[in-house]
């Protein structure tokens, strides 16, 4: 299997992004828990199923699914970040989950040895392909007839956790400019925001019974505002802006101070943080 290069995504996730996510895995799991629970609710998981996860990251959702499908089923997670793959493998070993494995593989350009998957899913893992139609076609080649596919992506509105930090950061650093991608959204956190666009490319890639919708989530951080301030550096457009602009520590401190002031309203009486979020959800079948 071959295809267009996805080298830029590989470089990002094998640089600071992958390292940062690995180091902050527990906090980010808390941060994204509601989104993951909503996605898992779209999957008809049962014992014995074979599951493929795209962009499996630190392995959190793969581990949840492995427990559900049991010893007669299995989960294979794909990622391109060596740092996150190493962490995921350590975690499944520590949890004695022998039915979960992880592959260093880009499904846009490479074939997986295994096939015949009953389910394919991705928790914010589909939107980093430079050629998403090709990637989706290659995924379909690994699925059984009638396999369920469900995944999510960030919506372009309704997410104060990244719209507020991005607006503030851009006042100091200038706008986040996206590189051209032949008229399609550039790979990144918002690439699969547009429901019409994503349902169209799913149809082009050969899927059936395609549905797309927006879903409200709650983004929570039980450790409080300062922990959230730390996490937002690694999730969403502000992380991209920081990588591109390389602000010095003094500028980062000013940005953080302004963000903190606006985020204070989301602090709960128990000291935790809860704020609304919005995701784009998708599901379809492999014909």
Functional labels for PLM-detected ranges:
Residues 133, 148-223:
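Conserved catalytic/acceptor-binding region of the Class I
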Residues 2-6, 10, 17-24, 210-269:
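C-terminal helical/coil "lid" or tail adjacent to the Rossmann-like core of SAM-dependent
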Residues 208, 278-287:
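Core SAM-dependent methyltransferase catalytic element
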Residues 2-49, 60-64, 87:
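Conserved class I S-adenosyl-L-methionine
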Residues 118-133, 155:
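A short SAM/SAH-binding and catalytic strip from SAM-dependent methyltransferases
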């Amino acid at each position: 299997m071959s295809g267009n290069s996805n080298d830029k995504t590989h470089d990002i996730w094998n640089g600071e992004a992958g390292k940062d996510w690995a180091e902050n895995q527990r906090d980010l799991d808390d941060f994204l828990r509601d989104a993951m629970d909503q996605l898992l609710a779209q999957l008809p998981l049962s014992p014995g199923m074979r599951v493929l996860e795209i962009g499996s990251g630190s392995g959190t959702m793969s581990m949840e699914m492995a427990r559900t499908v049991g010893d007669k089923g299995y989960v294979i997670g794909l990622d391109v970040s060596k740092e996150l793959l190493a962490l995921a493998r350590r975690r499944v070993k520590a949890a004695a989950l022998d039915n979960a494995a992880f592959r260093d593989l880009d499904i846009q350009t490479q074939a997986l040895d295994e096939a015949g998957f009953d389910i394919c899913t991705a928790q914010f893992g589909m939107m980093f392909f430079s050629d998403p139609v090709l990637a989706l076609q290659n995924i379909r080649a690994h699925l059984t007839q009638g396999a369920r596919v469900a995944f999510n992506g960030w919506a372009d509105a309704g997410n104060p956790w990244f719209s507020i930090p991005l607006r503030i950061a851009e006042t100091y650093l200038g706008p986040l400019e996206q590189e051209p991608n032949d008229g399609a959204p550039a790979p990144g956190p918002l690439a699969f925001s547009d429901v019409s666009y994503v349902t169209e490319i799913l149809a082009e890639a050969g899927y059936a019974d395609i549905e797309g919708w927006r879903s409200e989530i709650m983004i929570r951080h039980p450790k409080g505002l300062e922990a959230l301030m730390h996490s937002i550096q690694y999730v969403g457009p502000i992380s991209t802006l920081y990588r591109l602009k390389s602000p010095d520590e003094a500028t980062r401190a000013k940005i953080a101070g302004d963000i903190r002031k606006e985020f204070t309203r989301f602090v709960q009486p128990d000291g935790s943080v809860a704020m609304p979020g919005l995701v784009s959800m998708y599901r379809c079948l492999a014909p």
